[in-house]
């Protein structure tokens, strides 16, 4: 729920860098970047021009060797807090009813065209007047599902942790958004699930 400029601001603290030893010079990052931020030197290794980079992290998601990393450890949690703040700005003082379809849960943000198969089976539809309770219920439902075989987290290479989101992205901190959402008064993580 942010404009293009707003999304750049949300991602701003998460600008990536390249671990040179891991870069194989495949140019995947350059092909997917709409801003021309990745460049290649004589050693054929990528570097990210942070002045051109908008922090969308598409290069991070597509890198086949995980050579591209977030620059700051706190970046994912800061991004999640900013998302909560943008959400509050949109819904504050307005009557809202929120609906989430927990289907085709992909390992990456659904804005990435290179996404993989779903990581868990389809769960269903959830609805609430409280967006925080809704998100918590959806997360709990996803975490209760078995991992899909042949998905990014179903293979033996993924983290074998209980948290499917951390299995897909070990450095993620999805809970920061919900904690911050409660703190700023967006809603409550407590919910009562009524199945219809």
Label every model-predicted segment:
Residues 1-196:
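Extended, low-polarity segments enriched in aliphatic/aromatic residues
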């Amino acid at each position: 729920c942010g404009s293009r400029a707003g999304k750049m601001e949300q991602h701003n603290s998460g600008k990536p860098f390249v671990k040179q030893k891991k870069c194989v010079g495949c140019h995947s990052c350059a092909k997917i970047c709409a801003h021309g931020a990745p460049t290649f030197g004589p050693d054929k290794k990528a570097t990210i021009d942070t002045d051109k980079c908008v922090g969308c992290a598409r290069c991070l998601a597509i890198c086949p060797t995980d050579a591209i990393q977030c620059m700051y450890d706190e970046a994912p949690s800061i991004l999640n807090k900013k998302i909560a703040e943008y959400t509050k700005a949109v819904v504050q003082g307005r009557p809202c009813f929120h609906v989430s379809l927990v289907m085709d849960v992909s390992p990456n943000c659904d804005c990435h065209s290179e996404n993989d198969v779903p990581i868990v089976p389809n769960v269903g539809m959830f609805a609430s007047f409280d967006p925080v309770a809704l998100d918590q219920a959806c997360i709990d439902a996803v975490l209760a599902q078995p991992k899909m075989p042949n998905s990014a987290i179903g293979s033996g290479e993924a983290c074998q942790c209980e948290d499917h989101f951390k299995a897909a992205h070990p450095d993620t901190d999805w809970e920061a958004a919900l904690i911050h959402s409660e703190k700023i008064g967006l809603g409550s993580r407590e919910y009562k699930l009524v199945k219809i």
